[in-house]
From Swiss-Prot:
Tissue: Expressed by the venom gland.
Biased composition (Basic residues): 50-60
Keyword Magnesium: no
Signal peptide start-end: 1-17
Location relative to the cell: Secreted
Propeptide: 38-82
GO cellular component: extracellular region
Region entry Disordered, spans: 16-60
Family the UniProt entry places it in: Belongs to the non-disulfide-bridged peptide (NDBP) superfamily. Short antimicrobial peptide (group 4) family.
Source domain of life: Eukaryota
Keywords recorded for this protein, A-Z: Cleavage on pair of basic residues, Secreted, Signal
Protein name: Putative antimicrobial peptide 7848
High-level lineage: Eukaryota, Metazoa, Ecdysozoa, Arthropoda, Chelicerata
Amino acid sequence: MNENLWAAPAPKKLSKHFFGRGGPLGKETGPNLFPKKPGAGKGLGFPPTKKPRGQPRVLKKPKWNSEGLIGILHRGSDGVQF
C-alpha cells in the first residue's frame, strides 16, 4: 500500500498541482508572475530579483581585487617591488 501510494499517485498529483500553481519549481513561477505583474523587471517577481542579486556580487569581487591587489602591487606602497 505505501509503495504504491509513494510510487505513482502521490508524485503525479503533487507535480500537477505544483506545476499549475508554480510552487517550488521556479520555472513555472516565471511565466505565471510576468503576465500577472506588469513591469516585473523592477524586481516585483522572484525570477527578476534573483538575477540582479547574483550580478552585483560577481562585479564587487573583481573590483575589490583590482583596487586592492593590483593597486598595491603596481604602486608598491606595501613594500613589494614589482
